[in-house]
Amino acid sequence: MSNEFITFEKISRKSWKQLHQKSKPLLTQEELTNITSLNDNIDINDVIEVYLPLIHLIQIYKIAQENLSFSKSLFLKKDIQQRPFIIGISGSVAVGKSTTSRLLQLLLARTHKTSTVELVTTDGFLYPNSTLIKNNMLNRKGFPESYNMELLLNFLDTVKGGQTASAPVYSHEIYDIVPDQQQTFTNPDFLIIEGINVFQNQQNNRLYMSDYFDFSIYIDADSHHIEQWYLERFLSLLELAKHDPANYYARYTSLPQNEAIAFAKKVWKTINLENLEKFIEPTRNRAELILHKAADHKIDEIYLKK
């Protein structure tokens, strides 16, 4: 962390957990295990010490947004239009974005019992593999140019306008967009958008995805720790794919482990690390909140925009 974070207040985990005194976790260990991503590490104590204070903070932002919306409607002499409270979550591949997103979805639903809380990932807005292959971009998958940004921004604009919107569905098992399958959203109360690219400058240089966000989170960690998590996850995916020939990773299951690790290290260095250093990490100061993870996946520091 450097002067890049001069606009953030650094908060230790010890101080953060004291900002919210509720000790009831709102979910069971079994529920937490079911939403935890492969090779991630989180327990009930993390929920109580980190995520319950975060839910309380999000509630503060939501009340402020509602008050501003009400005041603007009075000023403009217009009726208030109900719009989703949109939360953007970004960070590297294998850093734990999906676990955080699913956990927030569940906790928000438990604390706002009459509200609808939806989750969408930007993976669904990747171009299909056939398009990437046609344009010789398959090895650039995950980089900014591999996303259909026009479709993604149109989706966000439609959702933010309170209208029904649909998003393509991505499958990590087939490593591609699922044909003829859509995820539909009808004016939810909360919408969580998770992806490596949610803070990136768009190709027209005029509009950011984050322009649509009411709150935003960046999951941070040292790159050598993320690399280790990525390699561990890759080996776990190979184990799962051994008995599923339709799985994308099945093609790598016949490799000796040392060759599989060497392959994963090459992918990390030439694709994921480059993407992280050039396009993902430089955007973290656009987040409202940064959650920093230590080597054991545990959040040890929190940075809140002043």
UniProtKB/Swiss-Prot annotation:
Keyword Transmembrane: no
Pfam families the UniProt entry points to: PRK
Keyword Transferase on entry: yes
Documented EC number(s): 2.7.1.33
Alphabetical UniProt keywords: ATP-binding, Coenzyme A biosynthesis, Cytoplasm, Kinase, Nucleotide-binding, Transferase
GO biological process: coenzyme A biosynthetic process
Catalytic reaction equation(s): (R)-pantothenate + ATP = (R)-4'-phosphopantothenate + ADP + H(+)
MF annotations from Gene Ontology: ATP binding; pantothenate kinase activity
Superkingdom of source: Bacteria
Stated family: Belongs to the prokaryotic pantothenate kinase family.
Name listed for the protein in its UniProt record: Pantothenate kinase
Source organism of the structure: Streptococcus equi subsp. zooepidemicus (strain H70)
